[in-house]
Amino acid sequence: MSLFFKSIKSKIEETLNHTPQVNLFNNSNNGGNNSNNGGNNSTPTLTKTPSTTNFPYNDYKNYTYKYVYDNTDNYNFNNNNNNNNNNNNNNNNNTKENNFKSIRESASIYKNNEEINNDDNNTIINKKKIEEEEDETNFDTSLIPKLGHEDKDELESDHYITIWGNGIRNYKNCNMSSIGFSEMYNQQKIVLISTGAIHSSFITDQGNLYTFGDGLLGKLGHGNLESYSSPKLVEFFQTKPSLRVVSIANGGKHSLALTICGKVYSWGGNDSCQLGLGNGSSSSYYSLPQLINFNISYNNNNNNNNNNSTNNNNNNNNDGAQQQFSLSQNSSSNNNKIKIVKLSCGTNRSAVITDKGLLFTFGRGDHGRLGLGEQSLLMQSTPKLVQSLQGHFIIDMSSGGGHSLVLTNKGLVFSFGRNDQGQLGIGCFSNQQTIPKQIQWFQTSQQQQQQPINIIKVSAGGYHSIAISDNNDTYAWGRSDYGVLGTSIDVQGDRNLPVLINSNSVVVDNVKFIDVSSGFQHNVAMSIDGSLYSWGCNAGQRLGFKSDENQLTPKKCFINSKDSKPLLFTCGEIITIIVEKRFKEPIIKTELQLPSSTQSQQQTELSLPSSVNSSSDSNFNKSIIDNSSTTTIIKQTNNNIKSTTTTIITRPSSPTPSFLSLANEGKDLLNSTQSNFIEWMTLISKSKGLLNLIQMKATSSLPNLGLSIEKKNKDFDDINRQLKLLVNSNLSLSPLPDNIQSEIDRLVLSRNQLGLGLVSEYQTSIDYWLEIKQQKDLTFLNLSKLLNLSTITTTTTSNTTTTTTATTTTTTTTTTNLINKKVLVHQDEKQQQREKSETELEEEQDEEEEDSEIKNGTLTAIEIQQQSFYLVERLNQGLGNFCNNIMDSTTMVQPLTTATASSTTATATATTTTANTTNSSGIINKNFGESLRLSMEEIQLIVLETQKYAIKYHSLLSQQLQQCDDLINIHRGKLVEVQDFLNKSKLAQSLLEQREKLKSDYRFCKRNSIELSKKIEVIELDYDQNLCDDDDNNHENNSVNNNSNNNNNNNNNNNNNNNNNNNNNNNIDNNINSNSINDSSNNNNNNNNIEKLKNELIKLKKDEQKLLSNQQEINELIIEILDKYVPEFKIKLRANDKISSRIKDTGLLVTDRKFQHYDIIKTLSTHPHNVYLANFNDQLVVLKEFGIGDAFGKQIFERQVSLLKQMNHKCIMPIQAVFYDRNAFMQMEYISGGNLLDWCRNNNNDNENNKRRQPWEIQKIFQQIIQAIAYMHSNCIIHRDLKLENVLIRQDGTPVISDFDLSKDISANVNVTVFNINGGTELYKAPEMKEQNVKGSYSTDIWAFGVMLYKCIFQFVNNNNNGNNGKNNNSDGNENDNNNNNNFLIIREPFLLPEENNLPLPANHSDQRLISLLSSIFQRNPKLRPTAHQIAVHPYFVTSLVEDLLSSRTLIDCREKIAAFRAHISSLSEMAEEMSESLQLTVRREHLVLDFFQFFFKKIESNKLFCRLEVSFQGEKGLDLGGLSSEMYSLLFSDNQIIDNSNNSNNSVSYSIPKNSLFSKKFNLFENSGTESPFYLLNSNDLFNNNNNNNEENNNNNNNNNNNNNNNNNNNNNNNNNNNNNNNNNEENPLLILKNEFTIFKILGKIFLKSIIDGKPIPDCFPTSFFKYLLGVKVNLRDLEIYDPQLAQSFKKVLVLDNIEEYLSTTFEGLIEGGESIPVTDLNKEEFIQRNIERVLVGCRQSKLEAFKSGFMSIDSLNAHFALFSPTELQLLMCGNTLVDSSVLQKNFKFIGFPDTSSTPKDFRRAVDEMNQDEIRLFLRFVTGMVALPLSGFEKSISIIQVPLSQKLPCAHTCSYQLDLPDYNDFDTTKKKLIKMLEYVDGFAFI
């Protein structure tokens, strides 16, 4: 009998774990994924999975079952995993074999599936090769990860996955925030986790890889592009034991995995080659893992002993010498192969770390993301070693948004990639860092620590970085938005250096962190006590807090408690995922006792963050039966009731006797009852499935916006009604009052915002209901399948009563048969009916009423769901009682054997015992049978009720699905309606623009038609006149007729020419007129022309009609749209119609511009118009407002816009845009240089504030002004208000005429004036305007121009009015200034007295051309005044005033000469710039001189030397704003050594000349006399015979000197010999490719001239003889002494010696013809010395000097200036200020970003003041690239920009004259850093 009850128990377990053959949630084989038109979400299913092994026959108390989440499609009661676990427990020795067997079985299924899939992206490439190369025995078990942050807990626990953040919405149907991973997957534990942008991966302790989340681009590795809401096993890695995954890394679009045998696989997006598959990979993504081929191995060149020694050394110090590796296809030993131990992924890049600490990267490489240098800035398709990190042992790496952090075993941190937000922590903000750079701050921190900071953990976020030190301090740097740096609100701004965050955030708790993970804009860290802290952006509650407010400092978000503790955590882009360990509830243990009543036990909730819903919030019922060794605990949790009931069923304390008959027949009963019992238990399991389906509620990650949509929709309609009413009621008002216009604007803005909000919410609502409908569809389908399968018991659903009766009969019969076959005592059913109590009858009545309610459809879905919870509780309790009854029977079988054995020993005793046993067992058997039958009937009643409710719920679901469809269609219709409404607004705007375009085209066409009609009429009249003339002159001779015809033709030509002048805009008319002119001599041709013109006129008429028709169509469409959708456009249309066509035709009108779009800075003027200085789109502009309330103001605005549009001249104020906003507005250029009056009063040179403008500056300005006036007059426009205040000056010195309020178009004959009838300012009015009320003419503008020039010359220019032409001015000019002021006092204002016809002018003025010009202008009779064109060609403007002053020697002062020269060059450069000419020069640093010479040789003519030179260095990025060209000149002219020869007469320092300098010996262009002289002259040797020729003349000269002074001669010979030897040993001259010595030195002269034109000084390293030769001045002994002091000293001794014949026996050989016969005597020794001086300094290099001079003097206009310079002045012009004045330099300093409290600017100035000349020159070169101060001053200021505090040296940007200076705030530190900076000038790169 014991066997029978054990069999019953086994069948119950087998039935409960039986899987019905039905797919509940999908009919397709797509991996469990469902999709429809409503979305891409998949629904998680309920799977009933045993959490222990197979049912233990010897101990039923260990059996439990649980409802858990699973993503499979079947309603599983599968126990295969439990069988495996049981087998593993029973046979530990075969564990590995069984696992491999299971893996191979699953692999065969997987491979079969792969054969069906034909998608190239979903197949395993090189599968055969992988199988052949895989080594299944070479497992590296050290790679297997351990449980993260796991401690030794004695209590059992489960792993749960908690998700924070809105990124979870991207996961399909993920409506839970916590996933019971261990319950879902057979008690597996998670050991490693990685999260990408919106997908995640987990590795378990069994080596399985699970992924879930967004599946786009196949980044989940499942062979498809589907997304999954819960972890799904990656089956690819189950195919082989060697594919066990030990490490995983997720990126933005892809994933990497490392297997136990060291192989790396990648899958997902491959748009940037981030999968590392090589260039042969053509696909943009792979949905299955692909093997990365590492064809790299270590070199083993040493023997084994050496290798062992090396290994030992490496073990002691892993950061030793760099590893040797080589590329190899086949390695002889596996020990040499690369072994990967660490993976890292970024957005589009990947990285791996080897066991030798090497780093390989691949993928996207821009901005240095891969750290491979500038050579790999694109994409790297295969792993490549980061060479610069060799020698460091890399142990960790973190990849952020665009940057990466690398950690070594010594705690050093390196960073590379993007650095625009300071995320690299290297102390600057730069665009990129292409190679890894160490963060030095940790080694030289400001934190006063005794030792450097060692880092143990790094994490890179989107634009920020986090690091943890070995003492658990946390540092952050990079972008500081959203509080992501955790430094509180007190520390603002991006940080380019690490900042300690613990002290600012958690100082009260004194929390230290041991681990950290960074997302795009948030961070999560684990403290030492195991709690989690988060900070940064909390959008979507990704930090675990309810509020969406950002967290500026670390705040505790997850507590390590006794119920749960966090183990692993990771931050994705916008989500946070935590793996937590939840401890199981302690087992309740009780002593053996009799059954007791049900006790209530309150369930303890897990400690979770307040913002995260616990797993108890799941939308399904969870039933758990826990079993101890002595007690069965049945739990039923109801989420709606939020309570837990626990029933404790305790075994009896002592055995109970069993029945003999039951034992005898148990064996036969086992076989006969098996089939019926399985059917009954299957029915129960299906009922449980039905109840679970009923309890499932459709949920969505999207909000239900029903109420919000309804409210917004109502508001939207109300606003439209209000807008229509407001517009229609005020449409007649013109203009609209401000309050009404403001209200209309407000309503329009509100309507548009509501419309956009409705579009978004309708779309969200549609997605919401589609998601709900999808879930309800699945539930409906699954209910249909289960109900169809249950027809074995129920026949139809139409007749509920009949079905119930039939089912009851069938089930009762089955139950009765079961009990009868068990030989149990049953009572008759009628007897049972009679024994029913009244209570039971009442219950039946209630059931009948309930059946009636179900049948009549009065129950709702919610009520049915509530009943299902009650039924589940009853069913669980019934099953528990049933199991209890069966299990108790096993205790009754035990005494049976004992009683039988004892009866054989004594018959009498046995008889008595048997009788007693029978009687006793009879009673017990009866009670047992009754209890068993009742429990079975109770279960069957529950099953029937379940079917009733399921049928009704199925019907309700059908109705709900129809309602969902209706609601979705309604919302879709509303969405289309709102979108159409918004689109109509855009359509109306487009139609208005088309309407205006058609109107403009119509006007143009109409004008052409009228003009063409007039032309046809004129031609016809001319033709008729010609015919009449022919008739009248029939009897005249042909010559007379011909003359008459010619005259007529001439008249025709004149008429046609006039028509041409009036119709320049019509190309067709011009062609017609041209044809008419050419053919007017022929009457036949005239007829043809008339026909052509008439045809053209007909075509124009047709075009007019077509344009009118199109206008009418658009007008009708506009009216329809405006009335229904956008009534506010009616006002806009009316206002647009009122705008003059003159404004519209300019193309300047901006219809959507408003005054509020401008940021008004200040008001510049209020009369006669409001003029504002405003900021628009980060640009300063001037906004001029015109009142257009009346026709007068409107006409003023339209005329001014029309006039300015006609003129396009650089000296006339341009209009940028016009718009209407109640008034009319004109946007113009903002000119910051002030007006002409201020310009004349102030001088640009701060050192000469007492001096006025120079005459040539005035001449240049007024020359441009008169050209602009001539341009205006040529367009028939007069200004009528010219004055100094109305002429503005740009920064480049260009004058701009403005304020055209009084301007007039004479051709239009418009007599509109403003404010006074004549207009203009009184002082500038012409006499006729004052006396005759003339309203203005061309001559009035000429008079005003003369007044401006008169005031500038006589009031603001330092002229010699007293006729003192030849007098030298003092340097300070005070005497002349006083004389000029006295002369100015007697000069009156420029107006005419009544008796005067012209203005008296000073007769003794130095510039008579100026007096002549002014005399011609200041004439009373307007007709006598010159025109603007005549003034422009007046001698005063034609002849350069600079040249005139030079020729008259008026410019005596050196600075005046140089200033005049610079002014002349400036004017010529501006002319070249106007022609848009520039010189583009790209040079190589290593071949700078050669590139420069070739550039001049091929492209540079003398007339192009004034063009702007734009320099770029090959392979370097940079924009030449002056700095790059300065650097190029500095490198060209002995860049590495600045030589100061200003006070140098005897310098004995030897200088090292760089190879790329003009002075390098390899070019052989210059030479010096020896080490005592630093000066250079052109080389006297032949460039092409340098290696073979020695200078015999020098040797002779040395021999001559020998006779005079042996010691000196010996020294000279030695020096000369050394020089010759050096010359002979020089490498080949690169310049010899030019093949012409004269060309080389001519180009050299042009280079020097170009440097002067560009204002780039050269070093002062040339003697005075060089400049004297250029100017034609004779050299002397002093010049030789500068160049060759030793030789000059010898000559001096010769001069002082008497009787020279006695000491020096030499002749004039080589100096003059026949000199060998002329001895040197006291009489001719001076001539001898002078000739030697000329030979040494000039003669031996005469040809080179001539070639140089031909290039240097190649521009004739500059030679006149050079002729006026002295050699010293020319030297000053070329070399600049050799003595750098620090005070002059400091006037150009501009400090930016330093706070007022900082002392660094003051300390910096002081440090510069204390520099010596050498240091200050180095400073000048470091910042600007120049070696001397230009005499013309700096082109722009030197910007000194504050950067965050650090110990780094200042950094210079020569392109922009910028110096990045840390805010040291200490003088000693500032000075020390500056001096240190100058020591390493050559080590700094010029940016």
From Swiss-Prot:
Pfam family, one: RCC1
Gene Ontology terms, MF aspect: ATP binding; protein serine kinase activity; protein serine/threonine kinase activity; ubiquitin-protein transferase activity
Assigned EC number: 2.7.11.1, 2.3.2.26
Compositional bias annotation for Acidic residues: 840-852
Extent of the RCC1 repeats: 206-260, 262-314, 356-409, 411-470, 472-528, 529-581
Gene3D superfamilies according to UniProt: Hect, E3 ligase catalytic domain, Hect, E3 ligase catalytic domains, Regulator of chromosome condensation 1/beta-lactamase-inhibitor protein II, Transferase(Phosphotransferase) domain 1
Superkingdom of the organism of origin: Eukaryota
Pathway: Protein modification; protein ubiquitination
Residue span(s) of domain HECT: 1501-1887
GO BP of this protein: protein ubiquitination
Active site per UniProt: D1281, C1855
Reaction catalysed by this enzyme: L-seryl-[protein] + ATP = O-phospho-L-seryl-[protein] + ADP + H(+); L-threonyl-[protein] + ATP = O-phospho-L-threonyl-[protein] + ADP + H(+); S-ubiquitinyl-[E2 ubiquitin-conjugating enzyme]-L-cysteine + [acceptor protein]-L-lysine = [E2 ubiquitin-conjugating enzyme]-L-cysteine + N(6)-ubiquitinyl-[acceptor protein]-L-lysine
Residues annotated for ATP binding in this entry: L1164, S1165, T1166, H1167, P1168, H1169, N1170, V1171, Y1172, K1184
Stretches the record annotates as Disordered: 19-55, 72-98, 299-333, 594-619, 823-858, 1030-1088, 1586-1628
UniProt xrefs under InterPro entries: HECT_dom, Hect_E3_ubiquitin_ligase, Kinase-like_dom_sf, Prot_kinase_dom, RCC1/BLIP-II, Reg_chr_condens, Ser/Thr_kinase_AS, Ub-ligase/GTPase-reg
Domain Protein kinase positions: 1158-1437
Ranges of Low complexity composition bias in the record: 26-54, 72-97, 1036-1088
EC class: transferase
PROSITE patterns: HECT (PS50237), PROTEIN_KINASE_DOM (PS50011), PROTEIN_KINASE_ST (PS00108), RCC1_2 (PS00626), RCC1_3 (PS50012)
Similarity annotation: In the N-terminal section; belongs to the protein kinase superfamily. Ser/Thr protein kinase family.
The name this protein goes by in its record: Bifunctional serine/threonine-protein kinase/NEDD4-like E3 ubiquitin-protein ligase
Species in which this protein is naturally found: Dictyostelium discoideum
